Regions:
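Protease-associated
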Residues: 1-74, 83-86
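Residue patterns forming the tRNA-binding/recognition surfaces of aminoacyl-tRNA synthetases
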Residues: 18, 36-38, 65, 69-159
Length: 159
């Protein structure tokens, strides 16, 4: 987590005992120190796809578009969705994983096949919570593209 965001993200952990520190910093690293370090995926639905492409996945990448304005200073990269993510994916030769079909539905590799990607959001959060892998799920207000004709969410879909 970015040092500048510690208080914002973790500062309320001591709500029941405000006299106690909310958190303790045990070690400090730069983003570059963590580059290429492996991590365990939250879901394993893309593991086989990555293996078929003979590409390494699930390691830390770095890029300059990550900011300290909100969140944790850590972002998820999905090279199949979004220009910045696609650029980072090419830079690090990440596998191209497409778990959403052309209609915007989750694919059979996921736990939610056939569910529209935006309707899957609460299902994903619930699965993470059930597995005790969810720290928090704050709602962030941000602009999101919608169809000018029918006002449905658009998906940036790389082919």
């Amino acid at each position: 987590m970015a040092e500048a965001l510690l208080d914002t993200v973790l500062g309320k952990l001591n709500a029941e005992n405000p006299e106690a520190p909310a958190y303790e910093v045990l070690e400090t690293y730069t983003g570059k120190d963590l580059e290429y370090k492996a991590y365990e995926p939250l879901f394993d639905c893309a593991v086989d796809i990555c293996k078929k492409q003979n590409k390494k996945a699930y390691y830390i990448t770095c890029d300059t578009y990550v900011t300290l304005t909100d969140g944790t200073g850590v972002v998820h990269i999905a090279p199949a969705f979004g220009e910045d993510d696609a650029n980072v994916g090419r830079k690090y030769d990440l596998p191209f994983v497409q778990l959403v079909d052309g209609k915007g539905d989750m694919t059979k590799e996921t736990p939610w096949p056939g569910v529209f990607v935006k309707k899957a959001d609460p299902l994903v959060l619930q699965a993470l919570e059930d597995a005790h892998l969810l720290f928090a799920a704050p709602k962030f207000e941000h602009s999101y593209p919608h169809c000018w004709r029918c006002d449905t969410p658009l998906i940036y879909y790389c082919l």
